[in-house]
């Protein structure tokens, strides 16, 4: 509400502030200043102060030209500079304070005035920059006086123009308000110019913003592209570095392999050379001995024998030492082979155990998955059954409601028929009585005496019996049972007979698929169990229907909750199935990775062994399958019996995985040590290799041939290994298939043999139980039939009494409900009237508040205008006083100068130098001007 006037006032104010620009445009290239701008007022005050100072202090000095203060003053000392800065700061503070107060007062006003102020502002604003034409202070003062006179004249004219000459009553009579409104309308050209200007500014601003956004987008895009290029370059660089590193690693591996092969070759060659040398030495020594023995003298035979004996002893000793050394080496080699065999056996048993464990887990997951699928299928079937039952229940409820409505309609129809019959009988009796009275009045009664006597008797007979017959004959057709084959639904008992027993019986029998005569009998028999209860007699159709609906609603809610629970269970089972599938996939992938790792380790181990051990390792690998089937058979037998029995000794032994991990750690440490030794040897052998390069060139051809042979042997060995592995896999698969077959046979025996037999036994028991129940029900029905007939007769008698009582209660309740309805209508009318009155009052109050706000805004605008005029008047008055004060000061200064001249002429020359004298004069004048300004 209050935002619109403020917006209008702000727009008016902006228009009023910018209206002077149209009138102050001059063809001169000089810049124009607004009267409200701070720079304009600062410059104005600076010029005025400069003129005042120049006129006050430099009248004597004819040598200096009259120019502005900034060009005249030659500040030579720091004291002068400080004084000048202080004076300038004080003057600027005064101007800033005055401008702040003016701006605050202008901003506080909400609107700038109507058309009254527009004329004055238009006349005053064009002359705002008139002071810039004057360079002398006297001319400026004259201009200000003329401006003040023109403002006073304009004020007086405005006052005369806006003075109310005629009373408000006469103005209303003459219709002058419309003319005033027309006069107060503003010039539309100003608003159009302002709007055009605003549109141009907005367009320029929008174009700048769009340009800025476009530049930002281009910069962002370029930065993003640069970053993307840098990232791609970084990725390429990293990929190249990784590729180079891999290539270097491959080269190093090739170098290491070549060095190992060359070292083996050199060792073998050295062994061969040593053997040849030993054989040659032994042959030479034997030849020498045989040659010398022929030339030995008999005296020297003893010496020769001793030498031979000593030589034999030495040979025996060397042979023993060699044999011991060989035995020691062979024992170490045998121990290493045995350890290797033990490790291989452990690894094989561990891998077999892992495979069997994985198979068992996979089988367990598969069985669990099958079980979950069966459970989900059963749950889905249950849900379908529940849905079917729910549909049946809703259909049965709908039929019950229709039956109930039909019985109500039958009641109403019977009552209407009774009323019509009663009305007809009354009309007939009335006509007969009229005829009898007419005959009596005409005197025909004596002639027709017998007929006249008989007429009243017949009338009385006709009045009484029709009512009774109407009650007796019209009511029974409503309670007659409809034929079973005529309609699909049975008519429920009437409205008066609906009891809690009936409702309970109907709700209990909802699940039965074919409601026939049995249901009719139970529905009729259950009310007879409570013949003396008054509560069952008072239950009406209005109570019975909500009960039935309430039971059905609760049941429906329960079924919905059960369905939601089953859906949640289904979702959980599906999640578990997915998790089991993922576990199976992970287990298969892990098994494949472990198998590949074992194969690569075996290959690397075989490649690292020396050539001397190749035939022995081949024999071991050939013999290992012979031992492995036994171990595999034992492990399979153990795993097959592990599901039934567990030996206690197995629990005491440590886990094979831990042993394998410890052995692998030891192997890794040994490999590291061997690699460190190899590196040292490589560094030592590099020097030797440089010397032996020439010899190696000649031997390369032979070595290449040997390498080819070795490759062929290795390929054959690998083929044998692969064949052995295939045989092992085939055996394992056969064993696993046998275990799976046994398990399948067991499951078939359990599922197809025992469980169907159990189900057959249970079905037979259930059939016997159902037959016994059926027989008991048949006996009950047979012997209770007579009792049921008698109870039905008593029930019919009681139901007639209940119907009569029910009709009385129904009349009372109808009257009470009608009275309550009338009271509620009156209350609603009263509330509506109160609401309408409140709305009307609040609307009137709202209009009054709005008018008061508009009046207050107008008064506030008038007050703001008055304050602006008063401030302007005060400023002009101060300027006028300031001019007078400056003139008086000039006169006083001239007198002082005259007195000083006279004193100087009389007295000797004791005066201070010129610049100190000037500073003294400046300080005096500025102190006087400051005190005058503060006082004013």
From Swiss-Prot:
**Biased composition regions of type Polar residues, renumbered to the chain:** 497-516, 527-541
Q: Which residues form a coiled coil?
A: 189-270, 364-440, 554-592, 662-739
* Claim: Coiled coil is one of the keywords in the record: yes
Keywords, ordered alphabetically: Coiled coil
From what superkingdom does this record's organism come?
Eukaryota
Q: Where is this region: Disordered?
A: 495-541, 607-656, 691-714
- Record's protein name: Coiled-coil domain-containing protein 191
- Species source reads Homo sapiens
């Amino acid at each position: 509400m209050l935002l619109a006037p403020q917006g209008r006032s702000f727009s008016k104010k902006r228009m009023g502030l910018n209206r002077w620009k149209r009138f102050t445009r001059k063809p001169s290239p000089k810049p124009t200043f607004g009267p409200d701008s701070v720079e304009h007022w600062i410059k104005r005050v600076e010029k005025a102060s400069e003129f005042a100072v120049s006129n006050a202090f430099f009248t004597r000095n004819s040598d200096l030209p009259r120019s502005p203060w900034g060009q005249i003053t030659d500040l030579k000392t720091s004291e002068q500079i400080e004084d000048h800065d202080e004076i300038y700061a004080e003057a600027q503070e005064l101007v800033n304070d005055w401008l702040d107060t003016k701006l605050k007062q202008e901003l506080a006003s909400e609107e700038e005035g109507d058309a009254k102020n527009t004329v004055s502002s238009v006349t005053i604003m064009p002359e705002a920059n008139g002071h810039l034409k004057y360079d002398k202070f006297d001319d400026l003062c004259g201009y200000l006086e003329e401006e003040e006179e023109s403002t006073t004249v304009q004020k007086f004219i405005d006052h005369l123009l806006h003075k109310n000459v005629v009373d408000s009553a006469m103005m209303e009579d003459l219709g002058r308000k419309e003319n005033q409104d027309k006069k107060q309308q503003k010039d539309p050209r100003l608003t159009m110019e302002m709007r055009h200007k605003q549109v141009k500014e907005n367009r320029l601003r929008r174009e700048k913003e769009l340009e800025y956004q476009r530049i930002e987008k281009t910069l962002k895009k370029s930065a993003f592209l640069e970053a993307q290029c840098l990232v791609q370059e970084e990725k390429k660089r990293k990929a190249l570095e990784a590729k180079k590193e891999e290539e270097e690693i491959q080269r190093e591996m090739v170098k290491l392999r070549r060095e190992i092969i060359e070292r083996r070759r050199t060792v073998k060659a050295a062994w061969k050379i040593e053997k040849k040398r030993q054989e040659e030495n032994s042959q030479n020594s034997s030849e020498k001995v045989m040659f010398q023995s022929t030339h030995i003298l008999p005296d020297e035979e003893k010496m020769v024998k001793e030498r031979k004996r000593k030589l034999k002893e030495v040979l025996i000793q060397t042979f023993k030492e060699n044999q011991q050394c060989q035995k020691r080496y062979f024992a170490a080699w045998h121990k290493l082979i045995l350890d290797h065999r033990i490790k291989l056996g452990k690894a094989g048993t561990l891998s077999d155990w892992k495979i069997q464990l994985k198979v068992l887990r996979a089988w367990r997951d598969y069985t669990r998955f099958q079980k979950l699928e069966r459970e989900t299928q059963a749950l889905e079937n249950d849900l379908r059954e529940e849905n079917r039952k729910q549909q049946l229940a809703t259909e049965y409820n709908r039929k019950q409601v229709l039956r109930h409505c039909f019985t109500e309609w039958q009641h109403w129809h019977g009552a209407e028929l009774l009323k019509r019959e009663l009305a007809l009988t009354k009309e007939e009796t009335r006509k007969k009585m009229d005829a009898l009275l007419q005959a009596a009045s005409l005197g025909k009664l004596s002639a027709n005496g017998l007929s006249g006597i008989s007429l009243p008797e017949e009338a009385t007979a006709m009045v009484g019996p029709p009512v009774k017959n109407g009650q007796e004959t019209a009511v029974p057709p409503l309670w007659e049972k409809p034929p079973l084959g005529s309609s699909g639904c049975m008519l429920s008992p009437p409205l008066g007979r609906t009891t809690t027993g009936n409702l309970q019986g109907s709700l209990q029998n909802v699940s039965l698929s074919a409601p026939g005569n049995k249901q009719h009998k139970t529905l009729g028999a259950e009310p007879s169990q409570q013949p003396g209860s008054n509560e069952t007699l008072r239950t009406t159709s209005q109570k019975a229907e909500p009960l039935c609906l309430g039971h059905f609603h609760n049941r429906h809610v329960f079924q919905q909750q059960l369905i939601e629970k089953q859906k949640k269970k289904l979702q959980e089972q599906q999640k578990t199935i997915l998790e089991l599938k993922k576990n199976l996939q992970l287990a298969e992938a892990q098994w494949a990775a472990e198998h590949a790792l074992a194969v690569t380790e075996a290959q690397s181990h075989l490649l690292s062994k020396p050539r001397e051990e190749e035939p022995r390792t081949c024999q071991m690998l050939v013999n290992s399958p012979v031992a492995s089937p036994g171990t595999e058979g034992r492990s399979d037998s153990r795993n097959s019996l592990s599901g039934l029995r567990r030996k206690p000794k197995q629990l005491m032994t440590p886990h094979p995985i831990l042993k394998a991990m410890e052995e692998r750690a030891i192997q890794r440490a040994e490999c590291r040590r061997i690699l460190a030794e190899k590196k040292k040897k490589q560094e030592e052998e590099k020097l030797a290799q440089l010397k032996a390069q020439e010899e190696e060139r000649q031997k390369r051809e032979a070595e290449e041939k040997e390498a080819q042979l070795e490759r062929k042997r290795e390929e054959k060995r690998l083929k044998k290994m692969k064949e052995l592995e295939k045989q092992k896999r085939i055996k394992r698969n056969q064993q696993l298939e046998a275990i799976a077959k046994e398990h399948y046979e067991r499951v078939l025996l359990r599922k197809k043999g025992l469980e169907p037999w159990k189900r057959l036994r249970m079905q037979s028991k259930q059939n016997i139980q159902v037959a016994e129940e059926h027989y008991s029900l048949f006996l009950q029905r047979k012997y209770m039939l007579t009792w049921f007939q008698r109870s039905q007769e008593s029930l019919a008698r009681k139901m007639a009494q209940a119907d009569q009582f029910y009709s009385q209660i129904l009349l009372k309740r109808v009257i009470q409900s009608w009275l309550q309805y009338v009271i509620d209508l009156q209350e609603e009318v009263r509330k509506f009237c109160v609401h309408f009155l409140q709305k009307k009052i609040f609307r009137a109050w709202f209009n009054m508040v709005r008018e008061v706000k508009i009046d207050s805004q107008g008064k506030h605008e008038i007050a703001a205008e008055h304050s602006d005029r008063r401030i302007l008047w005060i400023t002009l008055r101060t300027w006028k006083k300031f001019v007078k004060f400056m003139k008086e000061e000039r006169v006083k200064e001239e007198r002082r100068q005259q007195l000083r001249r006279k004193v100087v002429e009389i007295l000797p020359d004791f005066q201070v130098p010129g610049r100190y004298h000037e500073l003294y004069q400046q300080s005096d004048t500025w102190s006087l001007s400051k005190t005058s300004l503060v006082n004013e």
